């Protein structure tokens, strides 16, 4: 076999990230707007700016993809760790030219997935081999296969700018985002993020300023992009939380007080009133509004359960952020120590408001897992690509 490099054969993720950074420093397509940010920022006494990047992220499930397939009596029978057995059945049927009723998928324990096993490529591989060989076939990927042939979480770049009055109050707010869309995995020639992706922690940012603007940029998809846990909330939550802290530092106030100021005094966040095509995770805003009081309650809970405002030894500090994802509200405070350039996490506290917790232990374990997953991304995550 002689393989061709394809259109992304020279893709370099580090260089691509630099290009995205330069792009988000320019005006993009407006996704939400109130007032006139560009006019107001010129009137501001001072401004704070920041750019944040997130590299491609692999899923790295504890158990790599695996599937067993057996074609017998005109039936393709599959045993696989899949998150979407209906989709796996449909893809296998399409690949082999079989009726859907001729494909049976037995769902095994996932062994971790985080979105990776919603894609059935490894199932199709086993089914194809079993169909051609007419014997049972078991396929299991090595960790190297898993990392190299993942559907990665999107690489991204974000730009933020805030304008401050003479008294230090924030009067103007700008956010820009750029990342390859998941839709590019299914349809060619799509470069812009969907409204659903922009609804994940971007156009629904709970920022209440008189002048604000949210813009998106296009981005090429050079590798396969897929779902990973909270999807676009991963990079949007990181960018927003980091910048709120930057503004707090510029104002010399506590980050929790900075959040309170930016949340304002309204009862709900209404992105659709500012022109956003907001999807709210497919839920009704009447039933699941974005409630400001729930954000503020989380701040109070985390402050009360930690000593985050106490004096700390040299080299230690507390970080705080919060986010709404899939209609649940989460706040986290983290105490870290930096020694010789190495970040050591000493303590983490999380509060969640997910409404009625039918199984509190399950909610607790979910948040514990999210903490570990988030720390992995922040401290050790990331995939680089060179020569495609």
Language-model-detected regions and their locations in the chain:
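Structural alpha/beta core scaffold segments of enzyme domains
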Residues: 1-358, 362, 379-387
């Amino acid at each position: 076999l002689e393989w061709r490099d394809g259109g992304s054969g020279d893709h370099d993720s580090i260089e691509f990230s630099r290009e995205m950074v330069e792009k988000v420093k320019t005006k993009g397509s407006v996704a939400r707007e109130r007032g006139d940010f560009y006019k107001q920022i010129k009137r501001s006494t001072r401004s704070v700016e920041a750019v944040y990047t997130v590299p491609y992220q692999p899923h790295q499930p504890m158990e790599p993809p695996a599937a067993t397939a057996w074609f017998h009596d005109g039936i393709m029978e599959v045993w696989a760790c899949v998150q979407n057995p209906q989709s796996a059945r449909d893809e296998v049927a399409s690949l082999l030219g079989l009726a859907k009723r001729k494909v049976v998928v037995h769902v095994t324990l996932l062994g971790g997935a985080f979105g990776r096993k919603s894609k059935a490529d490894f199932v199709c591989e086993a089914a194809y081999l079993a169909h051609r060989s007419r014997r049972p076939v078991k396929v299991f990927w090595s960790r190297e296969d898993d990392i190299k042939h993942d559907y990665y979480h999107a690489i991204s770049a974000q730009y933020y700018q805030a304008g401050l009055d003479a008294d230090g109050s924030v009067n103007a707010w700008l956010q820009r985002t750029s990342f390859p869309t998941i839709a590019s995995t299914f349809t060619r020639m799509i470069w812009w993020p969907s409204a659903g992706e922009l609804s994940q922690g971007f156009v629904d940012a709970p920022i209440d300023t008189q002048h604000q603007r949210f813009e998106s940029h296009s981005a090429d998809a050079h590798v396969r992009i897929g779902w990973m846990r909270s999807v676009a909330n991963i990079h949007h939550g990181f960018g927003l939380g980091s910048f709120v802290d930057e503004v707090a530092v510029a104002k010399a106030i506590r980050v929790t007080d900075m959040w309170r100021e930016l949340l304002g005094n309204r009862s709900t966040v209404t992105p659709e009133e500012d022109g956003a095509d907001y999807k709210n995770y497919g839920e009704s805003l009447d039933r699941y509004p974005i409630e400001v009081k729930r954000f503020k309650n989380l701040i109070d809970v985390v402050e009360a359960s930690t000593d985050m405002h106490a004096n700390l030894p040299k080299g230690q500090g507390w970080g705080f952020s919060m986010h709404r994802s899939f209609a649940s509200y989460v706040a986290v405070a983290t105490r870290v120590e930096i020694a010789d350039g190495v970040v050591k996490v000493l303590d983490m506290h999380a509060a969640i408001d997910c409404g009625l917790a039918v199984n509190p232990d399950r909610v607790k374990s979910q948040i514990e897992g999210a903490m570990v997953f988030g720390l992995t991304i922040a401290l050790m995550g990331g995939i680089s690509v060179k020569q495609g």
